[in-house]
Amino acid sequence: MELKVFKDTIAAYGGRWETRLELPVETEILIPDYLPAVFKIVKCLMEPVVLQNRVSGGRWHTEGYLRCTVYYQSDEPGCRLYRTEQKFAFEKSVELPAGSYAEGPAQVWGEPEYCNCRAVSEHRIDLRGAYILCGAVLATKECELLTSLADCGIEQRTRELTGLQRVAAEEKTLTAETTLPLPEAAESVLDINGNFVLGAVSLQTGQASVQGTLQVQVCCQPADTEELLVRQREVSVQQTVELPGAAEDDMAVAWGEVMACTLTAAEGTGEADLNITWKLHLEVWHTAARTVVADAYSTVCQTQAVQTACKLLNKTADLTGRVSVVLEDDLPDPDVAVKGCFVTLGSAIPQTREEKDTEEEIRLCGKGTAHVFCADARGELTCYDKNFLWQPEGIWPGTKADACTCLGASMARITSSKTGAKLRVELEIETTGILLQATAHEALCEVELGEEYAEGSDGPALYLYYARDGERVFDIAKRYHARAKDLVTANHMETDGKAPQDLTTETACLLIPAAL
């Protein structure tokens, strides 16, 4: 008689492949003649704008530009601040190590490595620096597992494996438009940024519908004041995205980011047209369940079983909410006045929590920098940088290698002030997404039968076994090559609708009928 073996292949979690790419910058920024000449450079910022981000055919391809923004002062009296920027294009293609990877966008984040900026003339700025762009690609592993066995006196214990598989992922660049009151003639627009607040996301077969709000903040300096003011405008957006492979009962994760904004005067209306370019991130996860063989033996033959570990992702936490950060520090000069603050925000990534005498735990941690603009009595502006860490609430058991985040974060509120010589910055960070963690499950991938057991007519027909509380009936029967159902019947055990292989015992003396 031949053993019948049934197998199935499961797409399991294979880890995250990460890399760091250096984006060098060496350029000159020319100040247009219609802008005042450079007297002092106050701050230079570098920020990546990713236009293409795709994993396909064993390669990760990304392209976009670094937005290099320079804030400077002219030699005119007062705390007037001016802004100029230049885009520095980049394109990178990285060959992934041998393996299987999820198609679609990679997770991208980064931070400036260094930035040196100086004025070489009144209308020319020399910029040299580098930005570290990080990418993480989701790897998959094909696990071939046994799903059922039959004949040859085989006894098997099955279990159900449940996990999430990413079936679709998309990044789509979109535009939205609104109007604002036209800035005054001498008013300087220093920055336009914003964030996306998710309202609702729903799935249909092959597509997703997303509703939300774009909150745009326009930072400007009016002609009659030296303070930096912020005007806000909200724009409701609704978008349908084609997602082949998505189904109604899948789980969708969506977040957005504002990439660029353009403010142009509308002729004859007294208003300005605000064009917003933003990116929508969408991921669809499908819950897959498989019944596999966790253990097996034969009552008539020697059995060699091979186990393997299969890692599956499951949702651990919902990360949607707001994170508050309060920064306090002594100002280098107690007499300066705080004029305003910009924030550079980094992504929150899994980090190992360093605590002694405890099991390994992780938390999410991101970096950021508050750029605080201060003015002295002469009207000269200086930027003080205050680095900070921000953390979504929660600590989870596990390892960094088994954690996977689908998370978007953006600034929702910035407030800066001083009391005496003490600086205070209050931040609110809007987060949307989930945390996934992989759990290893043991299952059989191969079973081989050996020689048949010797005839047991001369051996005992019945054994006594003193079972401990919580022992599995299947494991006891396996020790004696007996059938689990015979053991349950002989000891009049209550099954409560469970299969004999799944029952556990109390502390008792059990009768083990020989199966040979």
List the predicted regions and their residue ranges.
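Short alpha-helical segments in extracytoplasmic peptidoglycan/chitin-binding modules
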Residues: 467, 473-489
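Membrane-lipid interaction segments
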Residues: 2-451, 456-459
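Surface-exposed, interaction-prone regions with an acidic/low-complexity signature
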Residues: 444-466, 503-516
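A structural signal for short secondary-structure junctions
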Residues: 421, 458, 468-469, 480
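Gram-positive cell-envelope targeting signals
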Residues: 1-3, 115, 310, 497-498, ...
